[in-house]
Amino acid sequence: RADYEAGAMSAEELKKTEDKAITELVAKQKEAGYHVITDGEFRRATWHLDFMWAFDGVGHSKTETGLPFHGEAAMIDDTYVTGKISYKKNHSFVEHFKFVKTLEDENTVAKLTIPAPAQFLEQMIMPFAWSNTKKFYDTQEEVAKDIAEGYREFIKEVYAAGCRNLQLDDCSWGMVVDPAACKLFGVTPKGLEKIKEQLLEINNSALEGKPEDLIVNTHVCRGNFHSTYA
């Protein structure tokens, strides 16, 4: 990917390299006895932000300061609102999933991992982001409404592509129970309770109307960048 970003590799060459690496990875998963297979997120720059970048109304640029993790700044792209957030059809993650789907067999099911709606919302309402987000939204509830609608559209599209196992990766819960949570979010204890409710509500709203045979699970952690955490 570094070669691609430096202009030393074409998009076609990058995809061939990714396809080969993912095929080898899935073979190892099967050898280990896994019944659920994934692409290891090999096509992404980060585990979560690439998903957001594919939405209308979301932009990103090379960071100068990074995000403060414990002991180190995570030097990942700044990601921010550029307009009203909405789902853009033909999301790249749907294509990513389709490739893994071709590697299924009678013993395995392809799973797609994406950031949870709460994670998306948190990215846009934390103090470092809200001053920009409020140029386009009057309230955080309006942001949540648009994000949830976008997720519902994405779920329809990836389900139509054959996805029956979707994982929501969510670092937001570890942050809201941190002893320093009020400082992190720039709120009072009462304000923090409101944020917790918002995170719960957006996750539930995004899943409204999902197909009954779509399995949705979640993974909760504090993030990972060079083995440090948010």
What are these regions (language model features)?
Residues 1-230:
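Domain-level signal for soluble alpha/beta catalytic cores
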